[in-house]
Design a protein with these regions (language model features):
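Alpha/beta-hydrolase fold catalytic core
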Residues: 2-81, 105-107, 126, 224, ...
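Conserved HGGG/HGGXW glycine-rich cap/lid loop of the alpha/beta-hydrolase fold
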Residues: 69-119
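Active-site loop/oxyanion-hole signature of alpha/beta-hydrolase fold enzymes
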Residues: 74-76, 114-152, 168
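Alpha/beta-hydrolase
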Residues: 85-86, 112-114, 178, 276, ...
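Conserved hydrolase catalytic core segment
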Residues: 146-189
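Flexible "cap/lid" loop of the alpha/beta hydrolase fold
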Residues: 176-208
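Conserved serine/cysteine hydrolase catalytic core
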Residues: 225-318
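Catalytic active-site module of serine/aspartate enzymes centered on a nucleophile-bearing elbow/loop
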Residues: 310-352
Length: 352
């Protein structure tokens, strides 16, 4: 009798178990369907709003074809040498909005959007500094912007302009490095800082994954900046191609700096000024801690000093009151420094 009861109880539990499993299956299928629906809605929202933004805010410069792709170039002013502005990682010509109009008062000045950034088409080539220099050379040539040039590079743009000068030395007569990255910085940073660097890489990858579905756009995580250019920043920095390019640029720089792939030589006696951020303003996030931030600032300062020795006429200036974006925090200093180098480069150009 007890055996019969046990068998009957087990038989009764099996249908209940199947019903529970069936309802769990329905629930999971419903959740999967909801996720798919949200993804479709998000992707549609991203596509429509991206198109609307680009129609509303057109680029101020010209779209020049380079190797079958359109690259945005914005030139103003007259005179020689022409100042070429190279932006930092993921940045576009708008990072120079406070300095370009003033520079145009004493010479010709051009900013541009690298491939996949701003209003420029994305390109299949990896964003190595050598490829970026090659694209810039083609852009300037196709647009009829003749050398000589004074190259100005911010952050990772500092490495790009050094590589450009190394590839096309006769084109360049002066250089300004604005809180420039250093080719060896990943190896020279304090080792505990690399944990934060890896977290930043993860952040860029999450943004890249979320952007095609409109998440950063919807929650307001893209296109933040000074109010006078915020709408234009939102137009370009909420684009899917921007998130993909930013991630690719960071990955490439991390690998190149870690492996020592980006090697360039001396600038000889070329006019050179290195502008560095104010250590008291902090170029590193609070999240890494006070002690590590101090160690990182010391390492950064040493690397900035190294950059100033690239030329026998090199000079380093610490931008008081400025963080990493010196051209935003201290546009006056950036303008005066570029003016100084332009004047010095005119004499240098005659001698070379």
């Amino acid at each position: 009798m007890p055996l019969e009861t046990a068998e009957r109880g087990g038989a009764e539990r099996r249908p209940r178990r199947r019903r529970v499993l069936r309802w769990i299956g329905y629930l999971l299928a419903g959740l999967a369907g909801l996720v798919v629906l949200l993804a479709i809605v998000g992707a549609t929202y991203q596509s429509v709003e991206s198109s609307n933004d680009l129609r509303t805010h057109s680029p101020p410069g010209r779209l020049i074809e380079v190797n079958g792709y359109k690259i945005h170039l914005y030139c103003v002013g007259d005179g020689s040498p022409t100042v070429i502005l190279e932006s930092g990682l993921g940045d576009n010509w708008l990072s120079w909005y406070k300095v370009q109009p003033a520079l145009a008062k004493f010479t010709r000045v051009c900013s541009y959007d690298r491939a996949g950034v701003g209003w420029s088409d994305a390109q299949p080539e990896p964003p190595h500094s050598q490829n970026i220099a090659l694209h810039l050379h083609g852009l300037l040539n196709n647009a009829g912007v003749k050398p000589p040039y004074v190259l100005v590079g911010h952050s990772i743009g500092g490495i790009h302009v050094r590589v450009y000068q190394n590839m096309y030395p006769s084109d360049v007569v002066g250089m300004v490095l604005v809180d420039s990255s250093h080719p060896d910085q990943m190896k020279r940073y304090p080792s505990p800082l690399m944990k934060w660097v890896r977290l930043q890489r993860l952040e860029f990858k999450l943004v890249k994954l979320a952007t095609p579905f409109g998440v950063p756009r919807f929650v307001g995580l893209c296109g933040d900046g000074p109010v006078e250019i915020r709408d234009m920043l939102r137009t370009v920095e909420c684009q899917t191609r921007w998130a993909e390019t930013q991630d690719a640029e960071y990955d490439d720089f991390y690998s190149a700096a870690s492996e020592g792939r980006t090697t360039v030589g001396s600038l000889g006696s070329m006019p050179l000024v290195v502008l560095s951020h104010d250590p008291d303003k902090g170029g590193f996030p609070d999240i890494i801690g006070v002690d590590l931030a101090k160690q990182s600032e010391i390492a950064w300062g040493e690397m900035q000093e190294d950059l100033s020795h690239l030329s026998t006429r090199g000079n380093r200036v610490v931008a008081k009151g400025a963080g990493h974006g010196i051209q935003i925090d201290r546009p006056d200093l950036v303008i005066d420094t570029i003016h100084l180098v332009v004047d010095a480069s005119r004499a240098y150009s005659v001698l070379h």
